[in-house]
């Protein structure tokens, strides 16, 4: 078959990458990589003008993984997609184009899986300290991902000292510890400044 021929010429790193992609596609296992850019994919339609789908691009080695923006967030955030470049994201593969050497993924499915696990297995509660990964940072607000939730916080949740511009301290991809202030089925409130208290 054509795929067997394609797979025969793979290096060990390439084979490992494809095996991880196939495993995620077949068993819904999570993969994690860094957002390296944005790509606009034309969608053929009968209407004029042509429709375009914007995707986040992640790549571990050679295979381009596209995460369409509608499948990136569970709830709309209004965050500029460019500010997410550099963030580490979890995702689940939902489509594979072996010959085109690319795959389609959904971060939203990974978030739902992580959220369910945090609420029903870990039973996160007020006062717990959890890992949080910075998704995007602006001058006065920061969005982190923790336990399957995207949480946006102002400066008062980050530090007891005033920060004129939070981008001087925080950046996409940075790993933080955060204290759970409250948690529910559809919400998580965090504080980075209160981790030690």
Where are these regions (language model features)?
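Single-stranded RNA-binding regions, centering on S1/OB-family and related RNA-binding modules
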Residues: 1-197
């Amino acid at each position: 078959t054509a795929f067997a021929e394609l797979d025969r010429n793979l290096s060990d790193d390439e084979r490992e990458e494809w095996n991880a992609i196939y495993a995620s596609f077949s068993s819904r296992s999570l993969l994690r990589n860094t957002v390296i850019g944005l790509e606009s994919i034309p969608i053929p339609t009968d209407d004029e003008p042509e429709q375009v789908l914007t995707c986040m691009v992640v790549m571990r080695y050679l295979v381009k993984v596209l995460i369409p923006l509608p499948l990136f967030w569970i709830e709309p955030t209004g965050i500029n997609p460019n500010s997410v470049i550099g963030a580490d994201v979890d995702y689940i593969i939902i489509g594979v184009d072996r010959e085109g050497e690319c795959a389609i993924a959904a971060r939203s499915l990974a978030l739902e899986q992580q959220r369910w696990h945090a609420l029903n297995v870990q039973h996160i509660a007020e006062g717990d300290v959890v890992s949080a990964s910075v998704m995007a940072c602006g001058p006065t607000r920061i969005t982190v991902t923790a336990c399957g939730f995207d949480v946006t916080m102002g400066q008062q949740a980050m530090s007891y000292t005033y920060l004129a511009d939070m981008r001087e301290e925080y950046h996409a991809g940075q790993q933080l510890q955060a204290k759970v202030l409250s948690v529910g089925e559809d919400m998580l409130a965090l504080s980075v400044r209160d981790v030690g208290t």
